Amino acid sequence: MIRVMENNDLAQCGMIYSKAFPMEHWGIDWTAENATEYLQDLFEQKRFVGYVYEENSEVLGCIFALCKISGSKEEIDIHEMAVLPERQGHGIGKQLLNAVKDYSKEKGLAGIVLYTSEYAPAVKFYEKNGFKLSNGTICMYCE
C-alpha cells in the first residue's frame, strides 16, 4: 500500500536506501545511519513530497521529491527513490512513481524531473514509466 511518508518512516527508508545503493555499484559508502541523515534533510524541506510503500507495517520502498519553481512553471523534482533489492521488479517502484505523478496532476504542476545514472536498468525502468531524456541537460561535477 502506498501512503504519505511520515517522520517515523525515515530510519526504515535509510536502511532501504543503504541496501539499494551499494558501494560497488554507486561508489558512495551509504550506511543506514548516514542515509537516514541525508533523507531527513530532504524530508525537512519546505516543499517536500514523499511516499512509502508498506506491507504488513514494513516499509519496502520510498520516494523523496521536492516541488520547485522553474521559471514560470512549477515542477516536482524526484530526488531519491529506493526499493529493497529483494523486492525490486515487483511493481513497488512503479507505484511510488505513480503516487508522485498523481500528486503532480492534482496540483496542476508542469511536470516531473529526475536525474539518474546511465546504469541501464534505472534508465529502462524510468523510460518504461513514461520518462524521457531531456534535451540539452547534462550532469557536471567538480571536486
What are these regions (language model features)?
Residues 97, 104-117:
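Conserved GNAT acetyl-CoA-binding A-motif
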Residues 52, 58-67, 77, 82:
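Conserved beta-strand in the GNAT
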Residues 83, 89-102, 128:
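Conserved acetyl-CoA-binding loop-helix of GNAT-fold acetyltransferases
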Residues 1-15:
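A short beta-loop-alpha structural element at the N-terminal edge
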Residues 68-78, 88, 134-135:
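A conserved beta-turn-beta hairpin within the catalytic core of GNAT-like acetyltransferases
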Residues 113-123, 141-143:
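Conserved beta-strand-loop-alpha-helix junction that forms the acyl-donor binding cleft
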Residues 40-52:
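A short helix-loop-beta-strand connector motif used in the catalytic cores of GNAT acetyltransferases and
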Residues 18-40:
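Conserved GNAT-fold acetyl-CoA-binding loop/helix
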